[in-house]
Amino acid sequence: ARNDFFRRELRAILKEYGNHPSFLLYCNGNELEGDFDFLNELTEYGRSHDNRRLFSGSTARKHVKAEQFYVSHRSDKGGVTIYEGRPMTDWDINAGHGTGQPIISHETGQRCVYPDFREIPAYTGPVEARNLERYRDSLAAHGMEHLAADFFRVSGQQTRIEYKDVIEGQLRSSLSSGFQLLSLIDFPGQGYAPVGILNAFWKSKGIITPEKFREFCAPSVALLRFQKRAFFNDEIFSGKAELYNYSPSRFRRPDVRWHVTDSRGTTLYSGRISCK
């Protein structure tokens, strides 16, 4: 009876949402446990009823034979999810993607931001901000409540830097079929996870603007590979420019303009790079 219920639900999903233009991928659930033989059967069942999309058994768990794509932290070839940046950018995770099957990196990033206690008054409904209140009271008990704003600001900027590094690492990986974040907003349930650049109310935390975020997470992104970030003044910087383009059209201009500015925005150097 239980398995029949899942089959009925799958048919209902395909019937109700089958013609939606964004319904490209179907997955039975997130990080599932239990009977993977049945999950394989259910995946086959979905494929037999609707061949317009790709099907997968579960994220971040066992492979099932019937699935057409896989969402996980790693494959049998290696890791495919990035959690932090490195002292250089001349790297990628192509090795983990060489399986012959599309792989989507699961829950990239997951950087926590220190709680913003100014959010507490926004909880006016049946949900109370007891988690935030506990963190606030703990900070006060340790005599550091005056540092709350600094902790929030500094951890937020670290999160901004980390997300930029890990997302650019994904985009440099030409064999990757994509990535997904744990969430753009804070996750208030099942254990508090303040991983968002937006709070639980979908409001900006002031960590980064949408325009700055799209500089490294967009259909087209300029990338630069280099061996290290710190140089002596007698060393020469060298790097390799790349262009990630998943937009609907090709770039018509063959050259890319670049410039280097100082902290005041003054242009120090500029030039052009010919694209291959």
Which residues make up each language-model segment?
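Carbohydrate-binding surfaces of carbohydrate-active enzymes
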Residues: 126-276
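Substrate-binding/catalytic cleft of secreted carbohydrate-active enzymes
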Residues: 1-198
